[in-house]
Amino acid sequence: MNAKLSSSGMVLKELPEVALQKISSNYYWAVFAVFLLCAIVFPLVSIFSLPQKQTYHRFFSILSLVSCLAYFTMACNYGLKNVFSSASFFREVSVRMVYYVRYIQWLINFPLIIVMLHWTVGVSILEIAYVVCYVLFAIVCLLAAALTSSPYKWAYYGFSFVGYFIALAHSVVLHKKYASRLETSARLGFLWSIVYLHVIWFLYYACWILSEGLNVISPIGEAIFYSILDLFEFGFFGAAFSWMLDLVGIENFKSPQSIPLGACSPADDKFSMCPDMEAQNQADDLAVETRIQISNLPSSPTKNNC
């Protein structure tokens, strides 16, 4: 009997504290309400917005709806798994609740944001897919790290950070390739969006170290940290990006792909190198000179028909 009680006591000692789990659940309900409001507001705004901006509001409504579903699941204490932690800094609790539904939310939302941002400046589909693949790779590796109880979790964490860094580097390259042809205000707006996205994303890695990684912060601390990042990344960012489009002017985000094949971009002036345009101009000049020469030729005498 005593052995059973001692064994059950050991199990209870290893499980997360019920009080903290209840507090974090209540907090998840509050964040769920915020995302639910965003999921309702963005579609309504898209109805009364310009046709050019309706697509963006639909993107933001999808982000809010996915986040709303994820936080509803976490508030109901579903979509989680208890994982033994090799490092315990919080009240000697060596079992950590890992909400894998949170990573499913990121697997959907982060690629959507990447597609929306790069589609705005006319990045090609293949280059967008290249960035999205590294984003998915980073999130899957981070999920594998969270579900791993051995020190090998840090290897998965390193792989995830490498994927994040490659996605960041490629976004910078795409900014120089595509956004450099835009007007100054549009170029700065796109750069601000990329910096905002990746700075918040970097904070996710810091939060992961403190929660799933080293088990430093409590479940309620993890809930607050992650929810603030989610609100800024998937909620506030939509309103800020929409305001930026109104401030800069969506017409200033000219897509390089909308330029006919063989033509130069509007940013190319007459002193820039544009072989196709130069060849077309030379052909037009040659045609004009030919018509002038033909018109200056003496007319041949006509024969009188008797």
UniProtKB/Swiss-Prot annotation:
It is found in: Membrane. SMART domains: Bac_rhodopsin. Has a role in meiosis. Belongs to the archaeal/bacterial/fungal opsin family. It comes from the Eukaryota. Its main location: membrane. Keywords: Meiosis, Membrane, Transmembrane, Transmembrane helix. It is a multi-pass membrane protein. The chain crosses the membrane at residues 28-48, 59-79, 103-123, 125-145, 154-174, 190-210, 224-244. SUPFAM superfamilies: Family A G protein-coupled receptor-like (SSF81321). GO terms for biological process: meiotic cell cycle. It holds the Pfam family Bac_rhodopsin. This is Meiotically up-regulated gene 73 protein. The keyword Transmembrane helix applies. GO terms for cellular component: plasma membrane.
